[in-house]
Amino acid sequence: MQSYASAMLSVFNSDYYSPAVQQNTPALRRSSSFICTESCNSKYPCETGENSKVSVQDRVKRPMNAFIVWSRDQRRKMALENPKMRNSEISKQLGYRWKMLTEAEKWPFFQEAQKLQAMHREKYPNYKYRPRRKAKMLQKSCSLLPADSASVLCSKVQLDNRLYRDDCTKATHSRMEHQLGHLPPINTASSPQQQDHYSHSTKL
């Protein structure tokens, strides 16, 4: 039960899913076993033992680097000055401004980042950054969702893939028909020499 609580904390950040509540709620215990048996696949097994520790570690945020330390206040300031500017555009502007700073101007933020990294190492001595691939994140999200939601999400992805393949097949077929329609007509009438050759072959 404790291992399941560790797994569910990665999805639901609420006290309702604490181990004590699970032990006192029979319905929740039944739903937990249902989700674990129906949603988890062989590629992403249910997290127990060592796997639960990895799940806890994945939730730990990386320490901020110098750019993130500098851009926190700059991003907030730019968003207030340009309320209609999209976040992606703000990020581009911040990246450009950071490159334009001198090493002396960047140095205080590097020092602050080093302090934060030292505090992070002290708090999480066994932390190792593990980047996730987007495709694996999608499959893992299916395994962590309730069975009904996971099946609907995964079915939608499969349906979109089938529709894409069908559209490609239809486009190829219509393109072939268009090319065949522009070919010169085949003359089925045979010449007199061909007819004589055919009649001679028949007599033989």
Curated annotation (Swiss-Prot):
Task: State the GO CC annotations.
Answer: cytoplasm; nuclear speck; nucleus
Segment Disordered: which positions? 176-204
DNA-binding region(s) from the entry: 60-128
Is-annotated flag, keyword Nucleus?
yes
Q: Tell me what PTMs the record reports for this protein.
A: Acetylation of Lys-136 contributes to its nuclear localization and enhances its interaction with KPNB1. Deacetylated by HDAC3.
Q: Give an example GO biological process.
A: cell differentiation
**InterPro entries in UniProt:** HMG_box_dom (IPR009071), HMG_box_dom_sf (IPR036910), SRY (IPR017253), SRY-related_HMG-box_TF-like (IPR050140)
Biased-composition ranges, Polar residues, are 187-196
Q: In which domain of life is the source organism classified?
A: Eukaryota
Pfam families, per database record: HMG_box
| Keyword Glycoprotein on entry | no
Where in or outside the cell it occurs: the entry states: Nucleus speckle; Cytoplasm; Nucleus
| Transmembrane annotation, as ranges | none
The entry's keywords: Acetylation, Activator, Calmodulin-binding, Cytoplasm, Differentiation, DNA-binding, Nucleus, Repressor, Sexual differentiation, Transcription, Transcription regulation
Molecular function terms, GO-annotated:
calmodulin binding; DNA-binding transcription activator activity, RNA polymerase II-specific; RNA polymerase II cis-regulatory region sequence-specific DNA binding
Self-association and partners: Interacts with CALM, EP300, HDAC3, KPNB1, ZNF208 isoform KRAB-O, PARP1, SLC9A3R2 and WT1. The interaction with EP300 modulates its DNA-binding activity. The interaction with KPNB1 is sensitive to dissociation by Ran in the GTP-bound form. Interaction with PARP1 impaired its DNA-binding activity.
Function noted in UniProt: Transcriptional regulator that controls a genetic switch in male development. It is necessary and sufficient for initiating male sex determination by directing the development of supporting cell precursors (pre-Sertoli cells) as Sertoli rather than granulosa cells. Involved in different aspects of gene regulation including promoter activation or repression. Binds to the DNA consensus sequence 5'-[AT]AACAA[AT]-3'. SRY HMG box recognizes DNA by partial intercalation in the minor groove and promotes DNA bending. Also involved in pre-mRNA splicing.
**Which family does the UniProt entry place this protein in?**
Belongs to the SRY family.
The record's annotation in PANTHER family points to: SEX-DETERMINING REGION Y PROTEIN (PTHR10270:SF161), SOX TRANSCRIPTION FACTOR (PTHR10270)
Name recorded for this polypeptide: Sex-determining region Y protein
Q: Which lineage do the record's taxonomy fields give for this organism?
A: Eukaryota, Metazoa, Chordata, Craniata, Vertebrata
Q: Which gene encodes it?
A: SRY
